[in-house]
């Protein structure tokens, strides 16, 4: 996603606009909608609705990865916390990646002999007075083990160190939730490891390092994680992603290209990785999460990884990355992977060259990159950074997918742009093999300030369902899409997290419902529907079952009669689901939240009366039909 300002590229539409208004959402008092839909036993076109249309996106954007990664300590390497993006926080709350160490005269950052990077922490311990380093705002659960590690050194044999988790009680006293006494630090850097088991549950826990004796204690690369993490990722996020079911997840964005991120810096022992300043989004990134951690996340949730390679790093860097992830253990970079603990190749299939790069020399660079990527892995599928007619004409023999990005509510404009790109493909030598992948999409990418909270709303979910219907109608050419973003992201994520938990946004519910109910064959639908209603239908290959997706953006229910006679006797509505406001208040700005995570719900459709179904106002429905 492009930061700071909106951009407009050829076939890459990124606008800053509001949630659709009256032209899409019918006003209060609109008459009830009566609709007859005839579902044709006829394919809309020769293409298929592929599961890959329901993908997601992960990038090093501010609070996105910190909200998924299980590390509980901020600034664990003591390099200093930098302000994040200048965008206003939509809730006015600090993000997870903003957590700093509590201020105290007991400790300071020291540039002399750090274990890693530029600085470490120095605790000044005076005789008879304990020195403390603390970090507040942590969430812990009763009975959970929290592995803790770090690197330390000291200049006095009198030093004694205790690690603890504590919480402040209403009476002003402190309750110790867990404690661990460490052995003495030596004069050179060494690693300590232990475990803290919490005897209570709170979202107001404090991690504390307490040193007694006399002298100086240095600490670096401290880490505290819940014991139930999944390869370093938060278990609750992993489980939510499994429920969401994205078949593909993209790794990339502005940080990767043209940003300062270097994939090879984020390999191996994370305590030894250099941090970097993310100039695009403003924060200092620890590099704890690199492409290898991302690929393992994808494998854990059953998704295919789609990896962006940096144009700025050059062709050889791209070749090395492919070899690192996919090469045999005997290859140069495959050996490095094996040394880091993974002998078997990861088998990453999808590779995108750059992110929203439209420089004059890009087409020639794309060809060189594509040949290098496929030279390292002949089975690789290569995606472009953006689509133009020139790119398709020149690069057709070397790539498989061209990729527009859409951040706008004008779906007529999106469809017009898709048709334009389809025309370029039809007119090219690659007409039989080139297809499209919308590798980023949402209603907006710009700076709304507090208005960005609308990205969490029912109104945005209704827009996203209509966008998915557009993809269904163009699925003969669009074979892959990645909704932006997976978590947090200034309200843009389908999953919103804090230190203690998460909730699923209305968009999450829509994406999961489409993923679970869609079928491969797009069908023709004969109907005269009002502008507030959007319909697509799809069937299984043998036509034994069908699903009708209905988006009702009106503020009155829609009574829908389905004509399924083309499918023969006994073919009828069998059930389905609907995403709606649990209170049915007729408001598009309703959201889920930590206080009320189930205001927008995904529920079973009321028992149909024959083939007649009532779709609630401001809702999205998936109606399943069969014998």
Regions found by a protein language model. Give the residues of each.
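Extracellular and organelle-lumenal recognition/adhesion modules and their flexible linkers in secreted
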Residues: 25-287, 304, 308, 312-313, ...
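Bacterial N-terminal signal peptides
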Residues: 10-21
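Hydrophobic faces of well-ordered beta-strands that scaffold small-molecule active sites
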Residues: 53-58, 249-251, 305-308, 349-353, ...
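C-terminal beta-sandwich/jelly-roll accessory domains of carbohydrate-active enzymes
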Residues: 553-627
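Conserved, mostly hydrophobic/aromatic
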Residues: 56, 150, 245, 298, ...
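Alpha-helical scaffolding within the catalytic cores
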Residues: 33-43, 105-109, 232-236, 286-294, ...
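Aromatic/acidic polysaccharide-binding cleft in carbohydrate-active enzymes
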Residues: 55, 60-61, 434-544
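Active-site neighborhood of glycoside hydrolase catalytic domains
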Residues: 324, 328, 340-349, 354-474
